[in-house]
Amino acid sequence: METLHGTTILAVRREGQVALGGDGQVTLGHTVLKGNARKVRRLYHGRVLAGFAGATADAFTLFERFEAQLEKHHGQLARSAVELAKEWRSDRVLRRLEALLVVANTESLLTLSGTGDVIEPEHDLMAVGSGGPYAQAAGRALLESTDLPADQITQRALEIAGDICVYTNRHITVETLPETREES
């Protein structure tokens, strides 16, 4: 059976703003099933952003588990991420889930994997998914050579990834913290 492919998620932090965005394409084999999927959401009373790459049903399960950890640990992002990673790695059912989560608040960006990894980026951006390397390269170039805010860097870098990666499109959703008046 063919598997669902593709997604690009990018998080960028600059000057007190964090932006997390993703494309909208869902692909099965060589066929685009949907072009406007929403892979980014707000959690914990709107104070945490999360995006996923991988199997959609698996990601929703992980969103629920992560939000439960956020509630349990009063919104502490790093502690909640570590606890989810431990649960994800040790639980026989969760271990089979195929997704990556990128989570962020205004202080931290983290990627969580099913192998128990909780990764904080070296620079103020993090990208995952099939177009992740393209979005990361574009985002880093924009971060280092322009004064654009985080949300505009995220939007533009994801558009560039959508132009290069066949599993990524230009239907971009960007969420920001703190919230801006005009969301992409």
Curated annotation (Swiss-Prot):
Subunit details: A double ring-shaped homohexamer of HslV is capped on each side by a ring-shaped HslU homohexamer. The assembly of the HslU/HslV complex is dependent on binding of ATP.
GO MF annotations, alphabetized: metal ion binding; threonine-type endopeptidase activity
EC number: 3.4.25.2
GO biological process: proteolysis involved in protein catabolic process
Localisation per UniProt entry: Cytoplasm
Major place of residence: cytoplasm
UniProt keyword list: Allosteric enzyme, Cytoplasm, Hydrolase, Metal-binding, Protease, Sodium, Threonine protease
InterPro entries: ATP-dep_Prtase_HsIV_su (IPR022281), Ntn_hydrolases_N (IPR029055), Proteasome_sua/b (IPR001353), Proteasome_suB-type (IPR023333)
Transmembrane spans: none
Activity regulation note: Allosterically activated by HslU binding.
UniProt function note: Protease subunit of a proteasome-like degradation complex believed to be a general protein degrading machinery.
Protein name: ATP-dependent protease subunit HslV
